[in-house]
UniProtKB/Swiss-Prot annotation:
SUPFAM superfamilies attached to this UniProt entry: EF-Tu/eEF-1alpha/eIF2-gamma C-terminal domain (SSF50465), P-loop containing nucleoside triphosphate hydrolases (SSF52540), Translation proteins (SSF50447)
Record's keyword terms, sorted: Cytoplasm, Elongation factor, GTP-binding, Hydrolase, Magnesium, Metal-binding, Nucleotide-binding, Protein biosynthesis
Protein name per its UniProtKB record: Elongation factor Tu 1
Matches recorded under PANTHER family: ELONGATION FACTOR TU, MITOCHONDRIAL, ELONGATION FACTOR TU-RELATED
Annotated InterPro entries: EF-Tu_GTP-bd, EF-Tu_GTPase, EFTu-like_2, EFTU_2, G_TR_CS, P-loop_NTPase, Small_GTP-bd, T_Tr_GTP-bd_dom
Example of a GO cellular component annotation carried by this entry: cytosol
CDD domains the UniProt entry points to: EF_Tu (cd01884), EFTU_II (cd03697), EFTU_III (cd03707)
Length: 396
């Protein structure tokens, strides 16, 4: 039989499991694929298959991640599960696996634990927009009051980090029972309930093409008689011939007009998210544009020098620093296509940051970069990656 081509009929959503070690994230992932493939087709993955997560590299950092996919009634899901806590931290900070929503797994027997809290905080910092809770191992708790207490604790913790704790869906079940074929409320029924909630609670994300136009500048050429051409890959939105464009970052913002879009040496009417294009700019001199700036829809993005960020510092084993750094540390921050030097302010009471740590910091850049919350960057020393980060909040 001929291999069937991937039919994208259903909308595609990216999710992942987060939560404390041994609370059942991987078992739940296995249970979801097993039960949903039985109902909607696809390929079931066992615990062992998911647990042997292959290594990937994102922004020069090695991360172990398992990717599974499944379908529900309405959607197609790509789901990530990580073997270790450090992998989650790295995954969320580098944005290697962007999540439209997360399934927070909490053991009903233990309640929220340190990594539960840390993953919720990380989700807030890196901009995971929605969290659904699966209260796992319900077969180990006989006392209904205890379940209620754990549920209250989870809701309080979510609210503390600005998620809507009172309105967050919490599904009570046992991933192991479901995997063993239990058809009861906490078995298969709980997994099917989770699938329904994924469909109804996580809205369809805005596609990259629907956002405001932005393109990081990779290269600039002048073509005699035609003007200046800027090349890059459109990150978001659409650019059409005749559109007004701002050139943002590194120096004062200037306005110009797109007089041509070309791809593979052909002239187009427009370029859109994902396209590698050359954009011809009217009346702009070659030396007015440089790598590291962005072309953007006027007013849609501003240049900033100061922001708070969540960063992960590579361990020595990962090729990072061998020694800690202190307040005032001045590495380069690599945004999109260029490095900008900046200094790091540590939180009150923190003396130093060790290789392998993740921490919230403030950064002051020496030149402004076009940025908004959720933008990823690498931290480098002389071209070598020593960390990764994500903009949590723009300050000025």
């Amino acid at each position: 039989m001929a291999k069937s081509k991937f039919e994208r009929v259903k909308p595609h959503i990216n999710v992942g499991t987060i939560g404390h070690v041994d609370h059942g994230k991987t078992t739940l992932t296995a249970a979801i694929t097993t039960i949903l493939t039985r109902k909607f087709g696809g390929e079931a993955k066992s615990y062992a298959q998911i647990d042997s997560a292959p290594e990937e590299r994102a922004r020069g950092i090695t991360i172990n991640t398992s990717h599974v996919e499944y379908e529900t009634d309405k959607r197609h899901y790509a789901h990530v599960d990580c073997p270790g806590h450090a992998d989650y931290v790295k995954n969320m900070i580098t944005g290697a696996a962007q999540m439209d929503g997360a399934i927070l797994v909490v053991s009903a027997a233990d309640g929220p634990m340190p990594q539960t809290r840390e993953h919720i905080l990380l989700a807030r910092q890196v901009g995971v927009p929605y969290i659904i809770v699966f209260m796992n191992k319900a077969d180990m708790v006989d006392d209904a009051e205890l379940l209620e207490l754990v549920e209250m604790e989870i809701r309080e913790l979510l609210s503390k980090y600005d998620f809507p704790g009172d309105d967050t869906p919490i599904i009570i079940g046992s991933a192991l029972k479901a995997l063993e074929g239990d058809k009861g409320d906490i078995g298969e029924a709980a997994i099917l309930k989770l699938a329904e909630v994924l469909d109804s609670y996580i809205p369809e994300p805005q596609r990259a093409i629907d956002g405001a136009f932005i393109m990081p500048v990779e290269d600039v050429f002048s073509i005699s008689g035609r003007g200046t051409v800027v090349t890059g890959r459109v990150e978001r939105g659409i650019v059409k011939v005749g559109d007004e464009i701002e050139i943002v970052g590194l120096r004062p913002t200037i306005k110009t007009t797109c007089t041509g879009v070309e791809m593979f040496r052909k002239l187009l009417d427009q370029g859109q998210a994902g396209d590698n294009v050359g954009i011809l700019l009217r009346g702009t001199k070659r030396e007015e544009v440089e790598r590291g700036q962005v072309l953007a829809k006027p007013g849609s993005i501003l240049p900033h020098t100061k922001f708070s960020a969540e960063i992960y510092v590579l361990s020595k084993e990962e090729g990072g620093r061998h020694t800690p750094f202190f307040a005032g540390y001045r590495p380069q921050f690599y945004f999109r296509t260029t490095d900008v030097t900046g200094s790091i302010e540590l939180p009150a009471g923190v003396e130093m940051v060790m290789p392998g740590d993740n921490i919230s910091v403030n950064v002051n850049l020496i030149a402004p970069i076009a940025m908004s919350e959720g933008l990823r960057f690498a931290i480098r020393e002389g071209g070598r990656t020593v960390g990764a980060g994500v903009v949590a909040k723009v300050i000025e």
